[in-house]
Swiss-Prot record:
Protein name: Phosphomevalonate kinase
Catalytic reaction equation(s): (R)-5-phosphomevalonate + ATP = (R)-5-diphosphomevalonate + ADP
Key words, A-Z: ATP-binding, Cholesterol biosynthesis, Cholesterol metabolism, Cytoplasm, Disease variant, Kinase, Lipid biosynthesis, Lipid metabolism, Nucleotide-binding, Steroid biosynthesis, Steroid metabolism, Sterol biosynthesis, Sterol metabolism, Transferase
Source species of the chain: Homo sapiens
Tissue specificity remark: Heart, liver, skeletal muscle, kidney, and pancreas. Lower level in brain, placenta and lung.
Database matches in Pfam families: P-mevalo_kinase
Induction context: By sterol.
Disease field: Porokeratosis 1, multiple types: A form of porokeratosis, a disorder of faulty keratinization characterized by one or more atrophic patches surrounded by a distinctive hyperkeratotic ridgelike border called the cornoid lamella. The keratotic lesions can progress to overt cutaneous neoplasms, typically squamous cell carcinomas. Multiple clinical variants of porokeratosis are recognized, including porokeratosis of Mibelli, linear porokeratosis, disseminated superficial actinic porokeratosis, palmoplantar porokeratosis, and punctate porokeratosis.
Domain of life: Eukaryota
Quaternary structure, from the entry: Monomer.
Effect annotated for changing residue 69 to M: Approximately 500-fold decrease in Vmax for MgATP and R-MVP. Approximately 3-fold increase in KM for MgATP and R-MVP
Main localization, broad class: cytoplasm
Keyword Transferase belongs to the record: yes
Amino acid sequence: MAPLGGAPRLVLLFSGKRKSGKDFVTEALQSRLGADVCAVLRLSGPLKEQYAQEHGLNFQRLLDTSTYKEAFRKDMIRWGEEKRQADPGFFCRKIVEGISQPIWLVSDTRRVSDIQWFREAYGAVTQTVRVVALEQSRQQRGWVFTPGVDDAESECGLDNFGDFDWVIENHGVEQRLEEQLENLIEFIRSRL
């Protein structure tokens, strides 16, 4: 049962800690595959849009990496959890509306319920990708541990998930990352 989007050939659900490089990896894949073939979907997009509307905030500023977003992050996490508890598929359904590309990269999968929703909706074409980075690498990218954020379910919900289909190591070694991206791209192309 494919809700409201097209029927994708492949759905890759990316997860990882803040500053692990999830967006970097998904954007690199999209730039190599082409935006006509590959859509990057962000579960946080509809969350931030709805949160901004309900709280009278600037939606565009919530999308960037500014201190503006950070000022609201804890409350946004709390608010998003309340929405998900009421309807676990709420944000998942929103991001697939009208998507026509055959390859979907969900750049910010954070919970087991997100994975379950996509597996139920799209079955065998759904795979999980964990992006990992050493704490030192994340710190070099600007990460600082924030209580109430880095220890919340939105950051830790998939820590013990177990068997990811793919693990991308993004420790700052460009050649190693490139090899992993090439392997993933080869797999993606085999699904087209």
